[in-house]
Amino acid sequence: EGPNIGLISYLASYAKINEYGFVEAPYRKVKKTYDEKGRLIDQVVTDEVEYMTADVEDEYVVAQANEPLDETKHFKRARVSARRRDDILEIDAEKVDYMDVSPRMMVSVATACIPFLENDDCNRALMGSNMQRQAVPLMVTQQPIVATGMEYKAATDSGTAVLAKNDGIVEKVDADHVEVRNAQGAVDNYSLVKFARSNAGTCINQRPIVEVGENVKAGQVLADGPAMRNGEISLGKNALIG
C-alpha cells in the first residue's frame, strides 16, 4: 500500500517477542509413544504449548490448526495437511511433530476481526485491516451483528475499558464512578474518564455498562471506552438492508 509498505508491522495473533528480540509463535506439542523396538504405538495432540522462532520451527512438521481430532485428541485421518519449511504438503499423521494453536495465528488482531476473511480478496483484506486503525470513535456505538469472536478480547486488551479488579457486587453506579464491594468487604472505586481529548484529537469517554446489585467477576468490563459497546470493539455501524 504505497511507499510506506513494510515500515509499519504488527505482531500476529498469539506471537510474542523473546529475550533476544526474535518473534516466537506457539504450537501444540504432539506426544509420541514408542515400543522397545522403536515403533510408534501412540500419538496424541497435547494441550502443552511450546513457543518457537521461525528457524526452529523449520526443523519440524507442523499440522494445521483445523485438522480434525477425535475425542481422545488423536488425528482422525491417516494423512493430514501440514507444512515443513516452505512446503505445504499432505503427510502421514505419524510424522507430525507439532500443531498450530489456532487458524487465526497467522494474522494480526485487526485482520482477525474481518468476518469470512478466507473468502476475501487479499487486497481488500489488507486495506480493511489498515483502515480499522483510521476509524473515528462514534458518539453512539453499535456492536457488530456479524462477528469473529476477537471483538471482546481486542476491546478488553485495548486499555480504554474499565475492568473489575476483584469479584464483587456493584454498589453504586453513576456517569463518573463505579463502586464494587469485593469478597473481602472492601469497596473498589473506579473513576471514569469523561470527554477527554486523545492524542489523535478524538473523544475519550467511558460509559458504565453494569447495574447496582449486579455480580461481577475479576476482569469483567465495568465501563465501555471509546469505540466499544457492551465490552466489544465497535468501530462502525451495521449495514442493514430491507
Please provide the spans of the model-predicted regions.
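Acidic, glycine-anchored pre-beta loop/turn
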Residues: 207-216
